[in-house]
């Protein structure tokens, strides 16, 4: 939520990412697969993810990685790795095929729930940064 608000430079749009991820998943589930798979960010997938017996079947983690990377136009693999979120080789290859700039691993620290004005972005690619609040 804070990431999307920062990306859009508008704290009021922060929660919109959840709606966009939901809509993206519905399009993946309901679209004419062959006609729309590339436009939805699944160009390397021969079949719709989740088809029974499909070797490239995805789970929720894969869908989140693909959807978030596609919507933000950033390679989100470092952040997923930071959080220990496992994704398949097929999803990793699809994100690599996008050719997007890598989003460094990050964490939004906050000492108040959902209070955007107090959020501090921590770059997690440099090890363990100090907690920014007293």
Where are the regions that the model predicts?
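Generic hydrophobic alpha-helical scaffold/packing signal
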Residues: 1-2, 22, 65, 69
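Catalytic cores of extracellular degradative/oxidative enzymes
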Residues: 1-9, 18
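Loop/turn elements at helix/coil->beta-strand transitions in domains of secreted/extracellular proteins
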Residues: 10-17, 75-76
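Short, flexible loop/turn segments with low-complexity composition
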Residues: 14-20, 81-84
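Long, well-ordered core segments of solenoidal/helical folds
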Residues: 19-36
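Beta/coil-rich, acidic/histidine-enriched accessory regions frequently appended to metallopeptidases
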Residues: 37-134
């Amino acid at each position: 939520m804070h990431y999307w608000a920062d990306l859009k430079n508008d704290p009021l749009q922060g929660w919109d990412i959840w709606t966009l991820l939901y809509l993206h998943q519905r399009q993946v589930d309901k679209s004419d697969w062959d006609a729309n798979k590339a436009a939805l960010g699944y160009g390397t997938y021969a079949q719709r993810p989740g088809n029974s017996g499909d070797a490239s079947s995805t789970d929720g983690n894969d869908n989140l990685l693909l959807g978030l990377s596609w919507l933000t136009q950033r390679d989100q693999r470092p952040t997923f790795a930071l959080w220990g979120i496992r994704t398949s080789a097929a999803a990793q290859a699809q994100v690599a095929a996008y050719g997007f700039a890598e989003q460094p691993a990050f964490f939004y620290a906050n000492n108040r729930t959902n209070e955007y004005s107090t959020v501090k972005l921590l770059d997690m690619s440099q090890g363990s940064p100090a907690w920014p609040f007293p």
